[in-house]
Amino acid sequence: MQVLVANDGSKYGKWALEWVARLPLVAPLSVKVLHVVDLGTLRAPFMVQPMVAGTERYMKAEVARFIANAKRTKEDSGARLKSLRLSGKVVTERGPVAATIVKTAARGVQLVAVGSRGLDALDRFMLGSVSAHVIHHVSCSVLVVREAPRPIQRIVLAVDGSAASKRAVQFLLKSMGPGRRTGGEEAITVTVAHAMPFLNYPELREAGKSIVEECSAKLLRGGYQVEQAATLGNPADEILKAAETHKADLIVTGAKGLGAIGRFLLGSVSTRVVQHAHCSVLVVRKTVP
């Protein structure tokens, strides 16, 4: 499996690489760690005109700092690849961060791992602008990392009977496996979560129950331990509650196809889950052969 890890040098970027090593993926991994240097984000503080005394010196110092950080990140990423026993390489590119990640992902990548936050030019933690762009513009699956890596023992799988959620189920069955764990002794437990709106239609409840039962049966045959969470309420909120209640290490959800404006649709439910989950989220777009 071709995996792209975006690492900006922040703790989230470093965690993303470690999460890839923790994922119970079946196929051998070929990992490319990407660090993007975006000199276009450089701005002199309080600059109100093109030339201000000291501006040139400041800009040169900032460029030097960016380059030094890139070198540091590349060396650290290489060392982490080796310590995690991952096969791959580290590359540095220049350009807009999100667009460069998307462009690189288009070259045969099957999974992108990105931190939910990162560092901007002033070393402030951004509110996910890069990860938000990536999940809406890459055509492959995306792992959004929110916390330090840990053994993956409990997964919440969001299902609704759509083609997108069926792809998420297939990803667990074909690309991941309960016998391919990297830490922890307990078997992986998948909570199949499905939420129905507050509508008094028995046929809807039966349909929801049928979806959960069908997915559960497939996962049981695949070797997972399975729990069920079929509830009434707002789907995104109920999935987030299930993740909290079942102490999920990871949420897995599907995504829709390509929209009319060239964005890969995530869907309102998956978007809200990615934005508000307490744990990392895997957004599945394609099932790896």
How does the language model describe each region?
Residues 12, 22, 38-41, 57, ...:
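Structural beta-alpha unit
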Residues 43, 100, 125, 154, ...:
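Short Asp/Glu-rich motifs
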Residues 64-71, 201-209:
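Glycine- and acidic-residue-enriched helix-capping/strand-helix junction motifs
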Residues 2, 17, 22, 26, ...:
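Gly/Ser-rich helix-loop-strand patches that form or flank binding pockets
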Residues 1-57, 84-86, 150-207, 213-229, ...:
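Small/aliphatic-rich secondary-structure junction motif
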Residues 70, 123, 208-209, 232, ...:
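Charged, low-complexity surface patches
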